[in-house]
Regions:
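Transmembrane helical cores of multi-pass ion-transport proteins
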Residues: 1-235
Length: 235
């Protein structure tokens, strides 16, 4: 239970930052992560697995959202899921052994670089305090695990610096500025775009990218967990 609570708390700042990259309300990524965690706990390839909104997928979805709107996310994700099911039926996981380790390393590092540059516009500011908080957050994340191992370092940084800005009365941009955080569960939203060839032309490049990136990340993570636990995952 403790592991589940700590994981949930660690995911909150992560998925909120990814929602900013994707150009959607933070509440959207939070609810999506809840659904993903529940689905993973039931249908996951191994016990005690969790998942949530991924920065790599946010990078793929972001350009489509900015160009065409949020309404195209749902059909794009549905199409990506269908593509991944087809990949699974075709035994795509078995082909992973033919990919050189250098390609895997380059893939992961490239995603990290893209996520970094996607955050730069939010970091670049004329307010020196924002730059200082950014640097202090990095230092806490790097050094906190050496002292406190029971609480995730990103959570420590967010709580500590949020309390600092709130108690000192600093007027800074907040997550609430990116979208509404009403605190209630949203209702089901039907498709807001027509299901026709025009929509398919818009979503299929994004859906294919989501499918490939999601598959690569999942298989890479599964391999890493297999190596750490010395047990096989159901790929």
């Amino acid at each position: 239970m403790l592991a589940g609570v700590l994981t949930a708390l660690a995911l909150i700042p992560e998925v909120i930052s990814f929602s900013v990259i994707a150009g959607v309300d933070p509440q959207v990524s939070l609810i999506a992560s809840v659904v993903l965690c529940l689905a993973m706990s039931i249908f996951g390839g191994r016990p005690a697995m969790v998942t949530a909104a991924a920065g790599s997928v946010a990078l793929v979805i972001g350009p489509m959202v900015h160009q065409h709107g949020v309404g195209y996310i749902l059909p794009a994700v549905i199409l990506a899921g269908i593509i991944q099911i087809l990949f699974g039926l075709c035994g795509m996981a078995r082909l992973m052994r033919f990919i050189p380790p250098a390609v895997m390393t380059g893939f992961v590092n490239a995603l990290g670089i893209l996520i970094f540059f996607a955050q730069v516009p939010h970091f670049w500011s004329r307010q020196p305090l924002i730059v200082g908080l950014f640097v202090l957050t990095l230092l806490i994340i790097l050094w906190a695990p050496r002292v406190i191992k029971a609480i995730p370092a990103p959570l420590i940084a967010i709580v500590a610096l949020t309390l600092y800005t709130a108690t000192t009365g600093q007027l800074l941009p907040t997550v609430g500025d990116e979208g509404s955080m009403s605190g209630g569960l949203p209702g089901f939203t039907a498709l807001t775009v027509p299901l026709n060839l025009t929509t398919l032309q818009i979503i299929w490049p994004c859906a294919l990218s989501i499918a490939f990136v999601g598959l690569m990340e999942s298989l890479l993570t599964a391999k890493l967990v297999d190596d750490l636990t010395h047990t096989p995952s159901n790929k």
